[in-house]
């Protein structure tokens, strides 16, 4: 819970000063973190779907729900309604534990890591992060996985603008890459 304490003690007051909010309820906060992982082209393999669910459970500490295909894709032998992967929404305590693990343990383990892209905001203060390898998380044992899969991390904030959201995420310790002009 170190990250939550940092947010409550330091980041909130810094954001209040930086953006001159009239009410403490206006200060942006992280509402939830959504993790999404698919089996990719192995969607026809039930074992691959099960592995995705198990890996998401290990990473998040919470049981994900199975995602299904919205449309049929002949090239992937995919039918509408077939299971594709898993998705989990983290809030409150689990969210802060995951963010702490992501920032302090997983991100430093990424090869040639120079920070996350500052362009991945959606215009409403939410941030999307793509992780190419699930093995950066300490819970995933390299010897036990069949295939390296990616993972989507969406950080949903109450910020109204990208600038506010970036200040919030930088405050809690997410390293953004330097943009060269």
From Swiss-Prot:
Protein's UniProt keywords contain Protein biosynthesis: no
TM region positions: none
InterPro entries for this protein: Ribosomal_uL5 (IPR002132), Ribosomal_uL5_bac-type (IPR020930), Ribosomal_uL5_C (IPR031309), Ribosomal_uL5_dom_sf (IPR022803), Ribosomal_uL5_N (IPR031310)
Leader sequence segment: none
Keyword Glycosyltransferase carried by entry: no
Cross-referenced SUPFAM superfamilies: RL5-like
A Gene Ontology term for the protein's cellular component: ribosome
Keyword terms of this UniProt record: Ribonucleoprotein, Ribosomal protein, RNA-binding, rRNA-binding, tRNA-binding
Example GO BP: translation
Domain of life: Bacteria
Single Gene Ontology MF annotation: tRNA binding
Recorded family membership: Belongs to the universal ribosomal protein uL5 family.
Subunit structure and binding partners: Part of the 50S ribosomal subunit; part of the 5S rRNA/L5/L18/L25 subcomplex. Contacts the 5S rRNA and the P site tRNA. Forms a bridge to the 30S subunit in the 70S ribosome.
Function: This is one of the proteins that bind and probably mediate the attachment of the 5S RNA into the large ribosomal subunit, where it forms part of the central protuberance. In the 70S ribosome it contacts protein S13 of the 30S subunit (bridge B1b), connecting the 2 subunits; this bridge is implicated in subunit movement. Contacts the P site tRNA; the 5S rRNA and some of its associated proteins might help stabilize positioning of ribosome-bound tRNAs.
UniProt protein name: Large ribosomal subunit protein uL5
Native species: Mycoplasmopsis pulmonis (strain UAB CTIP)
């Amino acid at each position: 819970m170190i990250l939550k304490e940092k947010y409550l003690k330091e980041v909130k007051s810094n954001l209040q000063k930086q953006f001159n909010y009239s009410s403490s309820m206006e200060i942006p906060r992280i509402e939830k973190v959504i993790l999404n992982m698919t089996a990719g082209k192995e969607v026809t393999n039930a074992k691959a779907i099960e592995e995705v669910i198990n890996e998401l459970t290990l990473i998040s500490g919470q049981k994900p729900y199975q995602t299904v295909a919205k449309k049929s894709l002949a090239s992937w032998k995919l039918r509408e309604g077939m299971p594709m992967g898993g998705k989990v929404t983290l809030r409150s305590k689990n969210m802060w534990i995951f963010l702490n693990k992501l920032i302090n343990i997983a991100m430093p383990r990424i090869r040639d890591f120079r920070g996350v892209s500052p362009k991945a905001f959606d215009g409403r203060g939410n941030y999307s992060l793509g992780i190419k390898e699930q093995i950066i998380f300490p819970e995933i044992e390299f010897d036990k996985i069949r295939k390296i899969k990616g993972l989507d991390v969406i950080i949903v904030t109450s910020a109204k603008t990208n600038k506010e959201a970036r200040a919030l995420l930088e405050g809690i310790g997410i390293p953004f890459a330097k943009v060269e002009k």
